[in-house]
Amino acid sequence: MLTIWRVRLTFRFCRGLILSVMQNRTETIGRDVSARRRTTRRGEETRRQLIQAAVECLCERGYAATSIEAVMERAGVSRGSVLHQFPTRTALIAGAIEAAMEIMMAHTRERMRDLPDAEARYRAMCDVFWETQKIPEGAAVTEALLASRWDEALAEAMRPVAMRVEAEIDDDMRATALAAGVKDVEACAVHARVLILTLRGITLELMYDKGRAMIHRALDQVRAQHVVHCEEMLGPAKNPS
């Protein structure tokens, strides 16, 4: 009888000890998870600030002047915070360009959504692309593309990002052309890419003098060629009733 009582007492003690340990462990895990979430949120905010600062530096000061020191000063963070998110300057620039490209795509998609239908979107493609090229992120991307001509590490870091973004752009243009009723969808995807490349070049030509008349005439010619392309693919534009 005494032995049974001792067994029961030992069992109750062990069960209480196990429950206490489990409760403490659960509370510790909960605190750890909350701390990790706070750390993650802070890290994400720091990363966002750094990317925004890098894009602004690229746009306003150029690639050569976009150093880690310049970015950390503009973002208002410590050098350690920068290096924790981006261990090298190349990683910082590549991260900023990836974000800039995504912002440019979002800008284009938002402008396209404002238009009434797929045909209107396709016909407006040249003007929408031109607007997108002129936003600060467009200038930052152009600056990095020029720098990648001689910076092999930057070119290597940007290559997979550019390939992914370009594939998304091509898919968007194919979907727009298909929805508009175009038969030769691939020709439209190529046309869209030609527009982007041409308009990016025009932004370069206008960087040091926005009033160059001949360059603006060239831009008008690009727009006129796009109208001809749309008439070939979609027929004449319908007059608004």
Regions found by a protein language model. Name each.
Residues 2-61, 65-77, 90-94, 99, ...:
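Basic, helix-initiating cap at the start of DNA-binding domains
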